[in-house]
């Protein structure tokens, strides 16, 4: 595309050079700039990428978007604007032909449940035989092809490229987890959402947002981003079991569907039957009552599957078809995932990393604990520590608790476990500053009939260590290796 055409609707501050040149790509990552690229520099929290402008010119970039003139050598056009990342969104959506307009785009926000709901929607679409994409904590996936990602919500250019890739590979729908960080930082500017889903709001990320009010406001941006053009068929799906839904309803101009278990809603789960193999409930809806079976465990997963079903139904799929598919869905990776049912213990991993999430996790597991409940949790470094003692208190609903760090980064692991221990309500706990050793200890003390829950990480494949270095780590693999060593079994014996 000609750069003149690309910048046509942007009121730039100053252009040094010519825009009468062809460009093929846009990037905010200096390492990926190449011949014909537009490079957008920005000043981040830790790095100002303006300092890489000479590098990108040497790599062949034809245009750089900056917030002040750069002293660099080479044949390059400089476009000076006050807000480079805002311009990056405009450029990316224009260059890639507004890809979110070309498929059904569903956004899921909330403190807990984002990954489960978004994954369930993706799996429902695949079960219906439709092309689908997922983007979130577990990576980026088009149909069954998956790649890992660094952030729940990628920066704006990378996000737009992923939506474009989904369109090019014939996805009919793309479901993405929408983080409060991504909303606050403007990473989703220009994304045309068709359905916005809210799961819940509990304390988290106050190290970034400062207050619960600011955190809640960030979540609400997804619903205001639906826009005001009422000629379009757009929907909000809100959890009536969370009081924050009332506020979100007030800022949403489109039709709203509410769901709930404990509070009256348009869509409700009734006559719930639970086991470690899944749940069965009557789904009471405005269009009839359906008998729903799912492989997911726990009351909170009933809320999650209702939200997913409503979202898919709202865009035209019959509820009968959705109910049929839901019965055979795969587990959501790292979300109340039972590892190897042949073991004499119930070994479970989960991503719960807030007090509310852990409460719901323990509520889900406790009815099926045959002997002891051994519960391992971690606290992340460089995060809001005000929530930590409450997490420790909730963990002590278990019979035995193991406190560990979780991505300690530059914080002292012993300090993190001590903060968790401040909330302990009994003395049946131990602290490990090495998470892997804590997991091995959990298995070592477990006896047949016990339930071991490894919480906080799910299948996250690394630990963030000092210097923000990512060291390979998998709770599930460490736990299984220790369990097979103690109890026997494993892949070689199956």
UniProtKB/Swiss-Prot annotation:
Residue positions where N6-carboxylysine is found in the record: 219
Keywords linked to the UniProt accession: ATP-binding, Cell cycle, Cell division, Cell shape, Cell wall biogenesis/degradation, Cytoplasm, Ligase, Nucleotide-binding, Peptidoglycan synthesis
Residue ranges of the motif L-lysine recognition motif: 406-409
Reaction(s) catalysed by this chain's protein: UDP-N-acetyl-alpha-D-muramoyl-L-alanyl-D-glutamate + L-lysine + ATP = UDP-N-acetyl-alpha-D-muramoyl-L-alanyl-gamma-D-glutamyl-L-lysine + ADP + phosphate + H(+)
BP terms from Gene Ontology: cell division; cell wall organization; peptidoglycan biosynthetic process; regulation of cell shape
Gene Ontology MF, one: UDP-N-acetylmuramoyl-L-alanyl-D-glutamate-L-lysine ligase activity
Pathway: Cell wall biogenesis; peptidoglycan biosynthesis
GO cellular component labels: cytoplasm
InterPro entries membership: Mur-like_cat_sf, Mur_ligase_C, Mur_ligase_C_dom_sf, Mur_ligase_cen, Mur_ligase_N, MurE/MurF_N, UDP-N-AcMur-Glu-dNH2Pim_ligase
Broad enzyme group: ligase
Modification(s) after translation: Carboxylation is probably crucial for Mg(2+) binding and, consequently, for the gamma-phosphate positioning of ATP.
Principal place of residence: cytoplasm
Compartment list: Cytoplasm
Highest taxon in the source lineage: Bacteria
Record: residues binding UDP-N-acetyl-alpha-D-muramoyl-L-alanyl-D-glutamate: 30, 152-153, 179, 187
Pfam families: Mur_ligase, Mur_ligase_C, Mur_ligase_M
EC number(s) per entry: 6.3.2.7
Entry binding sites for ATP: 110-116
Family the UniProt entry places it in: Belongs to the MurCDEF family. MurE subfamily.
Role, per record: Catalyzes the addition of L-lysine to the nucleotide precursor UDP-N-acetylmuramoyl-L-alanyl-D-glutamate (UMAG) in the biosynthesis of bacterial cell-wall peptidoglycan.
UniProt-listed HAMAP family: MurE (MF_00208)
Protein name (Swiss-Prot/TrEMBL): UDP-N-acetylmuramoyl-L-alanyl-D-glutamate--L-lysine ligase
Encoding gene, per UniProt annotation: murE
